[in-house]
């Protein structure tokens, strides 16, 4: 399984509120792209402004969390994925994502990459 991962930092001039508003629109476009390419799962998440995140960062000396993370799960290979992205429907969504990124993403401090999923586990909570 292939995952297209986007770890996004917001442009410095955007407030968290402005980023979140634009992130929803960006996420909708990622979901639409996922539908076009036959993805079997799409995840779009935004980091939380909570004390725990700051505490972990200070304790560990780590970088700030990404503002948003988008993952598109695809059952084919990397060459198949890139071939599908060239088709008119998916290409239109990619073009819109690139346009949205101009006003949203601090590209030099973000990252975009393909990954394989090596371990997966699902748990269900016992009923109350």
Regions found by a protein language model. Name each.
Residues 1-128:
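Macromolecular interaction modules
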């Amino acid at each position: 399984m292939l995952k297209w991962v986007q770890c996004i930092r917001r442009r410095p001039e955007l407030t968290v509120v402005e980023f979140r508003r634009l992130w929803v629109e960006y996420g909708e476009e990622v979901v639409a792209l996922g539908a076009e390419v036959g993805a079997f799962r799409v995840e779009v998440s935004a980091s939380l402004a909570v004390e725990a995140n700051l505490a972990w960062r200070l304790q560990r000396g780590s970088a700030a969390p990404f503002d948003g993370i988008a993952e598109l799960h695809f059952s084919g290979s990397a060459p198949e994925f890139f071939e599908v992205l060239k088709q008119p429907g998916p290409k239109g969504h990619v073009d819109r994502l690139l346009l949205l990124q101009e006003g949203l993403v601090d590209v030099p401090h973000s990252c975009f990459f393909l990954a394989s999923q090596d371990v997966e586990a699902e748990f269900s909570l016992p009923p109350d």
